[in-house]
Amino acid sequence: MQFQLFSFALIILNCVDYSHCQASRWRRSKRASYGTNPICKGCLSCSKDNGCLRCQPKLFFFLRREGMRQYGECLQSCPPGYYGVRGPDMNRCSRCRIENCDSCFSRDFCIKCKSGFYSLKGQCFEECPEGFAPLDDTMVCVDGCEVGPWSEWGTCSRNNRTCGFKWGLETRTRQIVKKPAKDTIPCPTIAESRRCKMAIRHCPGGKRTTKKKDKRNKKKKKKLLERAQEQHSVVLATDRSSQ
């Protein structure tokens, strides 16, 4: 009986102000209910409707939006499309401002592009820009093979000769000014040729080919044959008139 009276006296002393007792009891129940809420995990302060308001040190505050509702979360790392910004009061997750970026290091530097996009110097591209090439089968652009301007077209020639033929080939070239980052990256063509008409068809003092001689002889024979046929026709006509 004395023990019960002593316990009751302690309760009375601790709860002299009834309203203060009620407030303490409400705060304890509130912390207990919020503590079991997964939204409040890692929070220093949390709201039932808005989630985390402040995060524990080393965690990042992320404001998640679902339709018209938004609530705060405390995360160890920021989700895709966001990067972590550490501050004196609280660390926050900020949205990447780089187009087609899935994960970024800072506002203007992407470390992982979305699927189907190439990464180059913190930016994302549909294809590697001029002067760059994909590294093997990855979606990363590296320095490609850079070539200089084309030279003028060379002399028209055939079989190392600049005369004696009607048609030949002329060639132009360009030099590699920067080798690619890896040997597996191909370089553009550095030489190309096209058909051309020779300026000098017959070589001075040279002998014509047998093929040309045969062609010329055939023409002469044809002319001689035509002349002989004409003379024969004239003779026949003369004989008929004399008769």
Curated annotation (Swiss-Prot):
The record's FU repeats, renumbered to this chain, cover: 90-134
Q: Which GO terms describe its biological process?
A: BMP signaling pathway; dorsal/ventral axis specification; positive regulation of canonical Wnt signaling pathway; Wnt signaling pathway
Gene Ontology terms for molecular function? BMP receptor binding; heparin binding
Q: Which InterPro entries match?
A: Furin_repeat, Growth_fac_rcpt_cys_sf, R-spondin, Rspo_Fu-CRD_dom, TSP1_rpt, TSP1_rpt_sf, TSP1_spondin_dom
- Keyword Glycoprotein recorded: yes
User: Per the record, where are the segments of Basic residues compositional bias?
Assistant: 204-224
Q: Which protein family is it in?
A: Belongs to the R-spondin family.
- Protein name, entry field: R-spondin-2
Please report the organism this UniProt entry assigns to the protein: Xenopus laevis
Name of the gene encoding the protein in the UniProt record: rspo2
